[in-house]
Design a protein with these regions (language model features):
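A structural signal for short hydrophobic beta-strand segments in well-ordered beta-sheet cores
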Residues: 57, 69-72, 109-113, 155
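AMP-binding/adenylate-forming catalytic core of the ANL superfamily
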Residues: 40, 80, 86, 92, ...
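Beta-strand->loop->alpha-helix junctions that form or flank phosphate-binding loops
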Residues: 35-42, 61-63, 156-158
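Gly/Ser/Thr-rich phosphate-binding loop
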Residues: 2-56, 68
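Conserved ATP/PPi-binding loop(s) of AMP-dependent carboxylate-activating enzymes
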Residues: 62-66, 74-102, 133-135
Length: 172
C-alpha cells in the first residue's frame, strides 16, 4: 500500500458488495476514513447505502428515502423479485421507448426487506430448484465465505434424477 494515501477521509464503493474480509482490510488500513457502499443498477441508479457497516453485514444497506421497492412473486419467506421506482431512473435505451419516472425497473434480483434494509438473496437466473424448493446459491456462498480459512465460495446447480437439481459447492 502506498502510505501517501493513508489520509483518505472517504472511500466509496459501488457495484459488487465488499466482502467482509476486504471491508476489514480497508477499514484497518484507512482507520479514519468513512467507507460508504452503494447498491444500485445502471437503470435505477442508487437503491441503498451502507455507511461504515452500520447496516447488517448481510444486507446491501438502508433503502434511500426516494426509492420505492416492490417485491414480486414473494415466497413464504417474503423473498421476491426486486422492482424499483425512484426519481433517478434512466430515460431508456437507444431506439427503445422512453422510460417514465413511474415505471418499475426490474433488477433481476431476488431480495427481501427487514428493518428498512435490503437483502439480496440471488440473481433471478441463479436460483436453483431442488426437490421443488427454491435454493439461492448466494445465501450458501455467503455462509461458507464467513467460515475461517475460506477465501472464495461458489455454488452451482447440477442436474439430478430425483431432485431435479442439486447444489455443488466449490471453494478455496
Amino acid at each position: 500500500i502506498n502510505h501517501d494515501h493513508l489520509h483518505l477521509t472517504t472511500i466509496l464503493s459501488s457495484g459488487a458488495k465488499l466482502s467482509s474480509s476486504l471491508f476489514k482490510r480497508i477499514a484497518e488500513t484507512f482507520q479514519h476514513a468513512n467507507i460508504i457502499e452503494f447498491f444500485g443498477t445502471s437503470e435505477a441508479s442508487f437503491i441503498s447505502y451502507n455507511i461504515n457497516r452500520k447496516a447488517s453485514v448481510d444486507s446491501v444497506g438502508y433503502i434511500f428515502q426516494n426509492v420505492t421497492i416492490g417485491l414480486e412473486e414473494k415466497d413464504k419467506n417474503h423473498i421476491g423479485l426486486l422492482n424499483v421506482k425512484n426519481n433517478m431512473i434512466f430515460s431508456g435505451y437507444v431506439n427503445q421507448s422512453v422510460v417514465l419516472p413511474e415505471t418499475w425497473i426490474k433488477t433481476g434480483d431476488y431480495a427481501y426487506i427487514k428493518d428498512n434494509q435490503l437483502y439480496l438473496v440471488s440473481r433471478q437466473n441463479e436460483r436453483l430448484i431442488i426437490g421443488s424448493k427454491n435454493v439461492y446459491p448466494q445465501v450458501i456462498e455467503q455462509m461458507i465465505k464467513n467460515m475461517d480459512g475460506v477465501e472464495e465460495a461458489m455454488v452451482i446447480g447440477e442436474p439430478h434424477p430425483r431432485f431435479g437439481e442439486i447444489a455443488v459447492l466449490l471453494y478455496t
